[in-house]
C-alpha cells in the first residue's frame, strides 16, 4: 500500500500541473492529501510539518520574494541577452493572435473555430467579377515578360482608372478600403495570370507610402498624397534596402542630417540626405519616393538627441538630385524594380512622414505595418500562383498520355502531383487564416513571418514539382506556357521582405519565443524596470507553466494524446489530440532551450529554426482544420485534410527529433527525449495510398478540385493557358467514353491520338453520330493545343544591344 500511495501522490502532483491548478489551491490539496494518508495510517502525520515548511515560503509573498524571487531576479538580469533598439522595436511591434495559443501548450480549439469566416462585401465581389476579371483578360504574360518587359500602357491605365493601387486607402481619400481578405483574393487571382501584374498591384497595397501615411502621416500629408495615390496620379515606391544592409535593416548607411537650408528661395529647417538603395520595386517609374535613412541632429535643432535613428520621409522624385529610372532585371520576370540614389540633397523637415515629431521613429513605423503587408501580399501571390499551377498541372497530367495511359495515373507522377495539390490546399488555408486575424484588428508579426516563409517556400517546391511533371511543356517559353515564368520568378518571393533563410533561422522563433510566450516578455520588462514585485508573480506562473507542459508532454506522449480535449468526434478528432501534444512539446522545448542556452540561443540559429519549424507546422495544421470546418466539413475534401495535417505532424516531429539530436547539452537532451518521446516517434509522412487519392482529385473536374482553385481566372481566353487547359480537360473527358466505345466495337486498344481522323472513320462506319464526332474533333484540337509548345523565327528571340554605362561603378556588396 505504501508504494501505491506514493504512486497516487505522484499522479496527483502530475494532475495538478497538467490542469494548471493555482499554487495556493495546489498547496491546500497536497496538505489535505498528506493529512488523509496520515489519518489512514499509510503515512506519518508528522510529514505535514516538513511539507508545510516547504509550501509556506511559496505562498507567503514577502518570504517568497526574499528567499527565491530576488536571487533569481538578479541572476536573470545578468543573463538576459542584450537587445538592440531595432530588435526591441521589432518585438514590441504588432500583436499576438492564434500563434500565442499554439505556443502556450494548450490550444483553445473552440476559440479557433469561433473566429468568424470573412465574407466579401457586394462591392468587393463586384470588383473581383468586373475589373479584376478584365485586368486578367488584358494581361498577356508572354508579351509582358518577353516583348515589353513591363505591363502594356493600356493595362497600366486600366489599373489606375479602377484604383487597383488603392485597395488599402480609405474611402474618404478616394480609395477602395477593401478588407485584408478581399485584397488577398484579388492578388491570388492576378498572380494566377501574371506574376508581374500581381507584384505591381500588390506592392503599393503592402508596406509603402500609402500604408505609412494612413497610420502616421500628418493631416496635410494625408490630404495631399492619399487622393493622388488612390487615383494613380502618383506612383509610390519605398526604399529601404541598401547594398551594405539587406536583411540587417538597422545597419543602413543612408544618412540624413538636420540643418538649415534654402528651399524655394527661403531659409527653412530641413535635412541633407544621402542614400544608395537597390532592389526597390516601382522605383524606376515612381513619382514619390518613400525613403528610410538614419537621421542625426548634431546642432540639436529639433531639441532632442543628436542621433535620432531610422526615419522615414516622402520625397517627390522630381526633386533635383534624385537619381531614379534605371532598372534591375530580376530573373526574366521584369517587374519595375531598380536602384535609387541621392547625394547631399536638401529637403524640408516636413517631408518626414508624420512631421518632425516622428523623427527617429521609422523602424517602429515599418515593423508595425510590415506584419500586415508581409502577411497578405507575398503569401497571396505565391498561393494564387500555385492554385492555378495545380489545376493546370492536374489537367495536363490527365490530357498527356504515354504508353497509352494518362501520365497522371503513373505512380511516379502521382507523388509530385499530390504534393502540389496538398500544398495548394495548405497554402490557401494558411494565407486565408491570417487575414481573419488582420480583419479582427490584429497585427500578427510572428504569423506574418510564418506565412511568408511557408507559402513562398512551398510555392517554390510546388512549381519545381510541376516542372518535373510537365517536362518540355513547362520548359519551352511562349504564350502557351503556364509555368516557366513562375518557375523563374519563384526565388524572388523567397528573397524579398525578409530572406527565407533569415526568416526561418532568426525571425519566426526569435520573435515568437518572446512575443508569443505568456511570461517572457513581461519578465524582461520587469527586469528592465527593476520591478521585483512584478517579476515575483510572473516567475511562479512561469514555473507552473513549465511544470504543466512537462507533465502534459510526457502524458500525451505516453497516451499519444488520446486523453486530451478535442472539439469534434469525426475523422479529424485525432489530429486535434496530436496537435495538443505537439503544442505542449513546443512549449517545453522553448522554455528549456531558453533556460539552458540563455543569450546564446540567439546565435544557435539551427536550434531556433527547428523550434520555429514546430510552431509553423502547428499553425499550418490548425489552418487546414479551420478551413475544413469553415467550408462545411465536406467528406470529399478529407484526402486533402489528411495530407495537409499528416505532412505537418511529420515535419513537426522531425524538427523536434533533429533538435534533440543536436542539442548542445546532452544530459538535458536525454531528459527531454524521455519526456517528449516516451514511446518513440509516431508520425509518418502521407502514404502512397493517400498520395494516390489526392493526385486523383486534380485530374478530373469535381467540387473539391473547384475549391482548390477557388477564385482563380479560368476563362479559356486567348492569352490564358490555364483556362485553355481547363477547357481541354473537359473536352478530353467528354471524348474519353466515346473513344472507349469505339475501341470496344473494333476490338482494339487504340491510342488516344488523331481523334479527328478516328471520328471521321467511326462516323463512316456508323459507330458514332455527328455530335459524338464533333466531340472527338474538338477534343483533338484541345489536346494538341495542350501538348504542343511554341516556336519562333530566329530573329524573334534576339534582344537589342545593351548600352553599357560610360563609367563602370564600383562593385557593390552582394
Swiss-Prot record:
A Gene Ontology term for the protein's cellular component: cytoplasm
Q: Which family does it belong to?
A: Belongs to the acyl-CoA dehydrogenase family.
- Could you tell me what induces this protein? Is under the negative control of the global regulator FadR and the positive control of the cAMP:cAMP receptor protein (cAMP:CRP) as well as the alarmone ppGpp. Is induced under carbon-source starvation and in the presence of the long-chain fatty acid oleate. Induction during carbon starvation is cAMP:CRP-dependent and sigma(S)-independent.
What does the record give as EC number? Answer: 1.3.8.7, 1.3.8.8
Matching InterPro entries, A to Z? Answer: Acyl-CoA_dehydrogenase (IPR050741), Acyl-CoA_Oxase/DH_mid-dom (IPR006091), Acyl-CoA_Oxase/DH_mid-dom_sf (IPR046373), AcylCo_DH-like_C (IPR036250), AcylCo_DH/oxidase_C (IPR009075), AcylCoA_DH/ox_N (IPR013786), AcylCoA_DH/ox_N_sf (IPR037069), AcylCoA_DH/oxidase_NM_dom_sf (IPR009100)
Q: Which residues form a coiled coil?
A: none
Report, from the record, the phenotype seen after gene disruption. Cells lacking this gene show undetectable in vivo beta-oxidation levels, and are unable to grow on oleate or decanoate as a sole carbon and energy source, in contrast to the wild-type parent strain.
What Gene Ontology terms describe what this protein does at the molecular function level? acyl-CoA dehydrogenase activity; flavin adenine dinucleotide binding; long-chain fatty acyl-CoA dehydrogenase activity; medium-chain fatty acyl-CoA dehydrogenase activity
Catalysed conversion reaction: a medium-chain 2,3-saturated fatty acyl-CoA + oxidized [electron-transfer flavoprotein] + H(+) = a medium-chain (2E)-enoyl-CoA + reduced [electron-transfer flavoprotein]; a long-chain 2,3-saturated fatty acyl-CoA + oxidized [electron-transfer flavoprotein] + H(+) = a long-chain (2E)-enoyl-CoA + reduced [electron-transfer flavoprotein]
One GO term under biological process is: fatty acid beta-oxidation using acyl-CoA dehydrogenase
Query: Which pathway features in its UniProt record?
Result: Lipid metabolism; fatty acid beta-oxidation
- Keyword terms: FAD, Fatty acid metabolism, Flavoprotein, Lipid metabolism, Oxidoreductase
What is the recorded function of this protein according to its Swiss-Prot or TrEMBL entry?
Catalyzes the dehydrogenation of acyl-coenzymes A (acyl-CoAs) to 2-enoyl-CoAs, the first step of the beta-oxidation cycle of fatty acid degradation. Is required for S.typhimurium to utilize medium- and long-chain fatty acids as sole carbon sources for growth. Is needed for bacterial survival during carbone-source starvation.
In this protein, the active site sits at 497 (proton acceptor)
- Which co-factor is required? FAD
What's the protein here called? Acyl-coenzyme A dehydrogenase
Task: Specify the enzyme's EC class, one word.
Answer: oxidoreductase
Organism expressing this protein natively: Salmonella typhimurium (strain LT2 / SGSC1412 / ATCC 700720)
Q: Could you tell me which PANTHER family the record lists for this protein?
A: ACYL-COENZYME A DEHYDROGENASE (PTHR48083:SF18), MEDIUM-CHAIN SPECIFIC ACYL-COA DEHYDROGENASE, MITOCHONDRIAL-RELATED (PTHR48083)
Amino acid at each position: 500500500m505504501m508504494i501505491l500511495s506514493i504512486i497516487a501522490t505522484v499522479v496527483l502532483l502530475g494532475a495538478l500541473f497538467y490542469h494548471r491548478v493555482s499554487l495556493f489551491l495546489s498547496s491546500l490539496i497536497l496538505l489535505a492529501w498528506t493529512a488523509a494518508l496520515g489519518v489512514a495510517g499509510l503515512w506519518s502525520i508528522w510529514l505535514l510539518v516538513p511539507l508545510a515548511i516547504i509550501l509556506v515560503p511559496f505562498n507567503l509573498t514577502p518570504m517568497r520574494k526574499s528567499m527565491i524571487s530576488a536571487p533569481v531576479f538578479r541572476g536573470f538580469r545578468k543573463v538576459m541577452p542584450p537587445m538592440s533598439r531595432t530588435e526591441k522595436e521589432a518585438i514590441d511591434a504588432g500583436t499576438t493572435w492564434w500563434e500565442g495559443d499554439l505556443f502556450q501548450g494548450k490550444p483553445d480549439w473552440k476559440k479557433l473555430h469561433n473566429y468568424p469566416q470573412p465574407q466579401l462585401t457586394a462591392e468587393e465581389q463586384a470588383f473581383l467579377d468586373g475589373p479584376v476579371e478584365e485586368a486578367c483578360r488584358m494581361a498577356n504574360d508572354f508579351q509582358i515578360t518577353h516583348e515589353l518587359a513591363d505591363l502594356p500602357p493600356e493595362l497600366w491605365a486600366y489599373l489606375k482608372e479602377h484604383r487597383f493601387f488603392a485597395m488599402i486607402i480609405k474611402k474618404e481619400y478616394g480609395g477602395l478600403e477593401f478588407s485584408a481578405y478581399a485584397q488577398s483574393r484579388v492578388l491570388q487571382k492576378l498572380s494566377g495570370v501574371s506574376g508581374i501584374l500581381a507584384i505591381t498591384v500588390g506592392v503599393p497595397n503592402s508596406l509603402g507610402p500609402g500604408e505609412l501615411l494612413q497610420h502616421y502621416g500628418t493631416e496635410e500629408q494625408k490630404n495631399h498624397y492619399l487622393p493622388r495615390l488612390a487615383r494613380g496620379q502618383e506612383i509610390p515606391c519605398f526604399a529601404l534596402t541598401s547594398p551594405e544592409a539587406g536583411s540587417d535593416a538597422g545597419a543602413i548607411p543612408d544618412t540624413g542630417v538636420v540643418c538649415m537650408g534654402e528651399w524655394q528661395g527661403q531659409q527653412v529647417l530641413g535635412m541633407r540626405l544621402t542614400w544608395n538603395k537597390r532592389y526597390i520595386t516601382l522605383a524606376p517609374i515612381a513619382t514619390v519616393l518613400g525613403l528610410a535613412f538614419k537621421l542625426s541632429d548634431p546642432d540639436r535643432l529639433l531639441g532632442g538627441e543628436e542621433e535620432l535613428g531610422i526615419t522615414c520621409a516622402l520625397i517627390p522624385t522630381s526633386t533635383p538630385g534624385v537619381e531614379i529610372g534605371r532598372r534591375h532585371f530580376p530573373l526574366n520576370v521584369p517587374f519595375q524594380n531598380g536602384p535609387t540614389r541621392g547625394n547631399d540633397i536638401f529637403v524640408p523637415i516636413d517631408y518626414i512622414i508624420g512631421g518632425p515629431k516622428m523623427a527617429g521613429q521609422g523602424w517602429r513605423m515599418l515593423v508595425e505595418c510590415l506584419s500586415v503587408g508581409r502577411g497578405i501580399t507575398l503569401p497571396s501571390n505565391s498561393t494564387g500562383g500555385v492554385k492555378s499551377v495545380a489545376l493546370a498541372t492536374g489537367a495536363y497530367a490527365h490530357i498527356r498520355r504515354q504508353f497509352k495511359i494518362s501520365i497522371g495515373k503513373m505512380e511516379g507522377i502521382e507523388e509530385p502531383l499530390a504534393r502540389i495539390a496538398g500544398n495548394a490546399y495548405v497554402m490557401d488555408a494558411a494565407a486565408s487564416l491570417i487575414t481573419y486575424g488582420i480583419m479582427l484588428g490584429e497585427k500578427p508579426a510572428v504569423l506574418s513571418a510564418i506565412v511568408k516563409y511557408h507559402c513562398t517556400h512551398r510555392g517554390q517546391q510546388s512549381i519545381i514539382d510541376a516542372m518535373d511533371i510537365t517536362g518540355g511543356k513547362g520548359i519551352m517559353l511562349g504564350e502557351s506556357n503556364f509555368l516557366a515564368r513562375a518557375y523563374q520568378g519563384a526565388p524572388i518571393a523567397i528573397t524579398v521582405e525578409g530572406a527565407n533563410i533569415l526568416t526561418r533561422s532568426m525571425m519566426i522563433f526569435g520573435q515568437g519565443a518572446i512575443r508569443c510566450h505568456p511570461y517572457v516578455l513581461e519578465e524582461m520588462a520587469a527586469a528592465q524596470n527593476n520591478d521585483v514585485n512584478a517579476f515575483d508573480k510572473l516567475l511562479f506562473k512561469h514555473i507552473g507553466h513549465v511544470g504543466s507542459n512537462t507533465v502534459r508532454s510526457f502524458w500525451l506522449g505516453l497516451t499519444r494524446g488520446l486523453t486530451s480535449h478535442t472539439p469534434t468526434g469525426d475523422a479529424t478528432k485525432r489530429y486535434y489530440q496530436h496537435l495538443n501534444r505537439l503544442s505542449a512539446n513546443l512549449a517545453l522545448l522553448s522554455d528549456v532551450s531558453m533556460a539552458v542556452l540563455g543569450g546564446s540561443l540567439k546565435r544557435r540559429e539551427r536550434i531556433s529554426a527547428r523550434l520555429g519549424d514546430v510552431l509553423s507546422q502547428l499553425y499550418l495544421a490548425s489552418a487546414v482544420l479551420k478551413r475544413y470546418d469553415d467550408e462545411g466539413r465536406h467528406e470529399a475534401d478529407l484526402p486533402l485534410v489528411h495530407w495537409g495535417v499528416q505532412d505537418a505532424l511529420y515535419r513537426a516531429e522531425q524538427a523536434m527529433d533533429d533538435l534533440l539530436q543536436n542539442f548542445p547539452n546532452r544530459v538535458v537532451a536525454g531528459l527531454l527525449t524521455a519526456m517528449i518521446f516516451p514511446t518513440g516517434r509516431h508520425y509518418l509522412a502521407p502514404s502512397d495510398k493517400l498520395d494516390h487519392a489526392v493526385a486523383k482529385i486534380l485530374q478530373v473536374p469535381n467540387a473539391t478540385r473547384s475549391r482548390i482553385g477557388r477564385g482563380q481566372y479560368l476563362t479559356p481566353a486567348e492569352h490564358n493557358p490555364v483556362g485553355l487547359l481547363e477547357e481541354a480537360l473537359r473536352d478530353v473527358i467528354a471524348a474519353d467514353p466515346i473513344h472507349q466505345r469505339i475501341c470496344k466495337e473494333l476490338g482494339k486498344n487504340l491510342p488516344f491520338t488523331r481523334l479527328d481522323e478516328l471520328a471521321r472513320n467511326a462516323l463512316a462506319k456508323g459507330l458514332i453520330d455527328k455530335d459524338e464526332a464533333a466531340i472527338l474533333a474538338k477534343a483533338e484540337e484541345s489536346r494538341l493545343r495542350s501538348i504542343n509548345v511554341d516556336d519562333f523565327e530566329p530573329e524573334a528571340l534576339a534582344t537589342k544591344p545593351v548600352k553599357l554605362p560610360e563609367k563602370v561603378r564600383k562593385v557593390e556588396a552582394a
